[in-house]
Amino acid sequence: MPHLRYNNSMPLSGLLWREKAAGIKAERAIGMDFLLILLMLFLGITGGYLFLIAPSIRRKKKSIPPDFFRPYAHRGLHDEKCGVMENSLPAFRRAAEKGYGIELDVHLTMDGHLIVHHDHSLLRLCGRDRQISRMTLAQIQSYRLGNTDEKIPTLDEVLSLVDGRVPLILELKSTRFGDTALAETTFRRMQAYRGQWCVESFDPVLVRWYKRHAPGIIRGQLAYDPGKLKDERKKKSLIHFLSAHLLCNFLSRPDFVAYGHETDKNLSFRVMRSLFRPCLAAWTVRSLEDFKILQSQYDWQIFEAFEP
């Protein structure tokens, strides 16, 4: 019996084989296209992620003055049991005399003065539940720190006392996210200071202000991962998530990252540290044992409750 033919030229079995082969090739092509799309998506997402968490690439660690690489007394070398309160002139004097760098907190008062205090309220240290941003300098300095005769110092008073002896880390404590008035006012005041200083903040917009308007000033991004804390300090919000995972670094492009060392198992922090190798500061280190362990992992350590 003769073979059935298609168009009087090809056996039907041959046609079916060719159609099957063409189908296989088409499926392979579709599969390759799909894999290529997946690869492009992966590379795009990875590239975007790295773009977000990358620190500054213009100022490498080696270009930061060597004088900055030392331990920093957190809010000065304070000891409340000895009557030396945090962020007080005696605490700053003790730190400077011993050669420690100083980390301190800067607020803007209602009448435009710069004071040195950590909390937004006076409640913890002065026993009055009043907001610094809603008080004048005269009102703030009418109170005393704890049971001492010390008042909350102005930034001018601290600068006069330290007088360039040790480097300073100024943490900018903004009341409202993105309010750059504090960054600008601090910069104007610090232009006349002859000592070494740098700034840091949890607010990436304030750090970005220095990137855009004062790129010569060393700037740092403060962060920690509240999700890795086991106590009431946990915070859950979009801004805390972005901050914890360093996803705002694209705004600030920090010269150094100051990260809460208790939470530094965070994936973004570890990726950033491994790939970009930026200058790193650990906060807050509270024991000599931790200090020794962290020496090989961080460039600067901000410490309290002991002396390294």
What are these model-derived regions, one by one?
Residues P11-G14, E97:
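Short linear sequence elements within intrinsically disordered, low-complexity coil regions
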Residues E27-P308:
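Phosphate-group recognition and catalysis centered on beta-loop-alpha active-site segments
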Residues M10-P11, M190:
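Intrinsically disordered, low-complexity regions enriched in Ser/Pro/Gly/Gln/His and often acidic
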